[in-house]
Structures are given as C-alpha cells and as structure tokens.
C-alpha cells in the first residue's frame, strides 16, 4: 500500500502522527501515485487540505485530532494493530463538491462559498438561467450538503442529512424595506441546478464584495463579475458515513446539550 500524510501543526497532532507512521511501517510513503491520503487534524484542516487536491481514485482518510469530526472517520484510539484491517473494511465513495467558476478559473469547495459585503452591495442571483433575486444584505452562502454543519448552520441554514445530494443558498441579514423583500429562508436546490451570482463593478472599489471558498479569499478585481456555481463529483474518494445514526451521534455530541 502506498500512502501520503497531511498533518496539522497543532501540538495534539504530533503524537497521533507518530503513531500512524508506526502503524503504517510496512507500507510505502510516496509523494505521488498513492492509494491513501491520510489527513490528520480537525474539520477545518481537512477542508483546507482536501477539496482542491486532485488525486484521481485515491482514498482520503480523515483522522480527527481537533474538536469537530464530521469529515473524519478515525481518531487516535483507532490506530492499533488492527487499523489496516479496519481500513480495508471502509466504504469509500465520491462526493459532491461545489465548483466555483470565475474569470476562467475553477475552485472546488467542500463547505461553502461565502460572499460578504459591508455596504449591502447588490448581487443578482440566477437559478438555471432564471432571475431569482436582486439581493442586498451582508452576504450570501452557497454550498453542498457536506457544508450544512459548518458556516451554513451558524447562518441559520438547514442541517442536511447524508443521502440527500443538494445545493443550499442562504441569505445573511437581507436588507428589507417596502421595495426590497427577499425570500429570507434557506433555499434547497436539486443537485443538477446551476446558479449564478452576478455582481457589477463598484464605483468605489472598497464597496465591492469579498468572496471566500472554504475560508480562502478569492482575489477578484473590481469589475463586472459572474460566478457560475454547480455541483460536481470529487476525483478522490471519501469515507464519510451515510448512516443516519452516525450523523445523529455527531450532531448530538457537537451541537446539542441537554440536562
């Protein structure tokens, strides 16, 4: 078995990294052509590492050393003599990512594209070529199912269970007055839907919105800009559980506190 490891630099990750290397002692560490890509860290590190990493047919394995673990299947206690056997029993599959096409470049997104504006700068939204909204507010989020427990949840979006392959748009603090009323609710769209955000050049460049793909800022010029958004299949394969019980347990341990 050939493998590659990406590990966060947090203190709690280092002992887990050494333990993983020991477990993989009989395997071959390579830079290219690997069968498995091991990602050690929390969900934030996983997202920043994996979405745009183009490894065809490699299997991505998340090992949690952080707080959230929606993308990780293992933790330190799983790194025992039976780890490789557990790995062979895992089910890997391709998942939907959000493809953001702008200015001739494509960016892949695991959680969300976030659009921010501190001046309620207008954004035209089109769904499958049809004008949907002339939006003004503090920002917009759009992302695949996997992002529904991230920033989307904080913005009062829907938490979407595994097995439902959809696209979600969320308005953040929409500007409302008699002549400007938007839907004010999360929108859940079928996976084949194509969305466009259209932004006109600002007279004052400082008013132009800012765009972030999974927290990475897109350096876009102040100009007429169209972002084409759709779901695409990942080239790597992921071991993200589709079991309802697993997802419920993660939601309860992360977000729900009851006495």
From Swiss-Prot:
Q: Which Gene3D superfamilies match?
A: Probable inorganic polyphosphate/atp-NAD kinase, domain 1, Probable inorganic polyphosphate/atp-NAD kinase, domain 2
Please tell me whether the keyword Aminoacyl-tRNA synthetase is annotated for this protein. Answer: no
> InterPro entries recorded for this chain?
ATP-NAD_kinase_N, ATP-NAD_kinase_PpnK-typ_C, NAD/diacylglycerol_kinase_sf, NADK
- Primary place of residence? cytoplasm
Q: Where is the active site?
A: 43
What's the Enzyme Commission number for this chain? 2.7.1.23
Subcellular location per UniProt equals: Cytoplasm
**Which reaction(s) does its UniProt entry say it catalyses?**
NAD(+) + ATP = ADP + NADP(+) + H(+)
Gene Ontology cellular component list: cytoplasm
GO molecular function terms noted in the UniProt entry: ATP binding; metal ion binding; NAD binding; NAD+ kinase activity
Q: Which UniProt keywords apply?
A: ATP-binding, Cytoplasm, Kinase, NAD, NADP, Nucleotide-binding, Transferase
Q: Does the keyword NAD apply?
A: yes
**Cofactor dependence:** a divalent metal cation
Which of this chain's residues are annotated to bind NAD(+)? Answer: 43-44, 111-112, 136
Q: Which NCBIfam families match?
A: PRK00561.1
Q: What does this protein do?
A: Involved in the regulation of the intracellular balance of NAD and NADP, and is a key enzyme in the biosynthesis of NADP. Catalyzes specifically the phosphorylation on 2'-hydroxyl of the adenosine moiety of NAD to yield NADP.
Sequence similarity = Belongs to the NAD kinase family.
| UniProt-recorded name of the protein | NAD kinase
Q: Which organism is it from?
A: Mycoplasma pneumoniae (strain ATCC 29342 / M129 / Subtype 1)
Which gene underlies this protein?
nadK
């Amino acid at each position: 078995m050939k493998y590659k490891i990406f590990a966060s630099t947090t203190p709690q990750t280092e002992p887990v990294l050494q333990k993983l290397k020991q477990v993989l002692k009989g395997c071959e560490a390579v830079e290219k052509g690997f069968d498995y890509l091991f990602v050690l860290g929390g969900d934030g590190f996983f997202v920043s590492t994996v979405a745009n990493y183009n490894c065809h047919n490699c299997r991505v394995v998340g090992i949690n050393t952080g707080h959230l673990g929606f993308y990780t299947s293992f933790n330190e206690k799983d790194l025992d003599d039976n780890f490789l056997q557990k790995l062979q029993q895992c089910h890997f599959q391709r998942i939907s990512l959000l493809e953001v096409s702008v200015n001739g470049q494509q960016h892949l997104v695991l959680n969300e594209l976030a659009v921010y504006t501190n001046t309620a700068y207008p954004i035209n939204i089109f769904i499958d070529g049809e004008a949907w909204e002339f939006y003004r507010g503090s920002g917009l989020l759009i992302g695949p199912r996997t992002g529904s427990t991230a920033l989307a949840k904080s913005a009062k979006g829907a938490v979407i269970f595994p097995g439902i392959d959809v696209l979600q748009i969320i308005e953040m603090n929409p500007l409302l007055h008699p002549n400007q009323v938007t839907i004010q609710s999360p929108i859940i769209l079928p996976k084949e839907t194509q969305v466009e955000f259209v932004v006109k050049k600002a007279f004052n460049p400082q008013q132009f919105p800012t765009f972030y793909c999974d927290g990475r800022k897109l350096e876009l010029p102040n100009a007429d800009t169209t972002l084409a958004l759709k779901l695409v299949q990942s080239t790597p394969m992921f071991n993200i559980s589709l079991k309802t019980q697993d997802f419920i347990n993660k939601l309860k341990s992360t977000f729900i506190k009851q006495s």
